[in-house]
Amino acid sequence: MKDSLVLLSRILAHPDSRCWFLAWNPAGTLLASCGGDRSVRIWGREGDSWICKSVLCEGHQRTVRKVAWSPCGNYLASASFDATTCIWKKNEDDFECVTTLEGHENEVKSVAWAPSGNLLATCSRDKSVWVWEVDEEDEYECVSVLNSHTQDVKHVVWHPSQELLASASYDDTVKLYREEEDDWVCCATLEGHESTVWSLAFDPSGQRLASCSDDRTVRIWRQYLPGNEQGVACSGSEASWKCVCTLSGFHSRTIYDVAWCQLTGTLATACGDDAIRVFEEDPGSDPQQPTFSLTAHVPQAHSQDVNCVAWNPKERGLLASCSDDGELAFWKYQPSEGI
């Protein structure tokens, strides 16, 4: 492996607590972290250092599990084990909690904005996925409650350019949803993982979806539209999703997160074996049966489980990670020549 993942900086982001998740703002200038200390922290670069610009600690009563920025970068959503989601409005360096979304019966596990910024999705241990509509007055209204999963829903993510939503669950499946006649419907169920699906990531085109699981594999699913040249069967006008690649044998424990770089198409994983791994699609790889190579591996990236990896949306190769050890780390991925 000629490629390298170089540590740039390591910060104790959430002392005496797990650091659960990270999210870059769309400009790539700020990073939000959240943790078991009930806080959200905003990090910004000053020179070669990353410093804490703001601590948001008034919004939640329990662990903050996930954070997500709006596409405009002016709002931050935080999902908490207290069963609420807070919406924070950015005013220069300060953030104000302007709305608290309530309705889930149990812990909210994930939150994600649609690319338009007009829709927000949340999911929970109560097995449901909620879709919220945002109007011009920044009022949030639940427009659909989806009960397609049979267990705890771990993660939600939107397609990068369409209003297509994906969710991952403790029931070992991935589900996809779209709007149909003023309501949201489940339009596909992706089966194949043998245990909990922890996280999801679309590739830059939105034609492929990566899923990672407690079964220690990453699966790559490809979308096939009706009438596709490959002859993959579709139901009526619905697209079909097929697993075209399984990355197995690389991880020794649960894979908690997968991130697909929107600039380079590089995959990164966060694992319960304390490691970070980076995969590149092989040059000339068949799109219908793609192959990926492990190009970087940091065995002790953190001293405990790695919970999240996040590629910077503007700076190639800049990767952030966080862990049960409460730390946040910044890495520079340097691919070898020829990739």
Curated annotation (Swiss-Prot):
Tell where it localizes: Cytoplasm
Q: Which UniProt keywords apply?
A: Chromosome partition, Cytoplasm, Repeat, WD repeat
Placement of sequence motif LYR motif: 176-178
SUPFAM superfamilies given in the database record: WD40 repeat-like (SSF50978)
Q: Which CDD domains match?
A: WD40 (cd00200)
Q: Which domain of life is it from?
A: Eukaryota
The GO biological-process annotations, alphabetized, read as: chromosome segregation; iron-sulfur cluster assembly; protein maturation
Q: Which GO terms describe its cellular component?
A: cytoplasm; cytosolic [4Fe-4S] assembly targeting complex; MMXD complex
Q: Where are the WD repeats?
A: 14-53, 59-98, 103-142, 148-187, 192-231, 250-289, 301-339
Q: Does the keyword Cytoplasm apply?
A: yes
The cross-references to InterPro entries, in alphabetical order and at most eight, read: CIAO1/Cia1 (IPR028608), WD40/YVTN_repeat-like_dom_sf (IPR015943), WD40_repeat_CS (IPR019775), WD40_repeat_dom_sf (IPR036322), WD40_rpt (IPR001680)
The record describes its quaternary structure and partners as:
Component of the CIA complex. Interacts with CIAO2A and forms a complex with CIAO2B and MMS19; the interactions with CIAO2A and CIAO2B are mutually exclusive. Interacts with CHD1L, ERCC2, IREB2 and POLD1. Component of the MMXD complex, which includes CIAO1, ERCC2, CIAO2B, MMS19 and SLC25A5. Interacts with WT1. Interacts with CIAO3. Interacts (via LYR motif) with HSC20.
Family in the record = Belongs to the WD repeat CIA1 family.
Entry function: Key component of the cytosolic iron-sulfur protein assembly (CIA) complex, a multiprotein complex that mediates the incorporation of iron-sulfur cluster into extramitochondrial Fe/S proteins. As a CIA complex component, interacts specifically with CIAO2A or CIAO2B and MMS19 to assist different branches of iron-sulfur protein assembly, depending of its interactors. The complex CIAO1:CIAO2B:MMS19 binds to and facilitates the assembly of most cytosolic-nuclear Fe/S proteins. CIAO1:CIAO2A specifically matures ACO1 and stabilizes IREB2.
Q: What is this protein called?
A: Probable cytosolic iron-sulfur protein assembly protein CIAO1
Q: Which organism is it from?
A: Bos taurus
Q: Please state the gene responsible for encoding this protein.
A: CIAO1
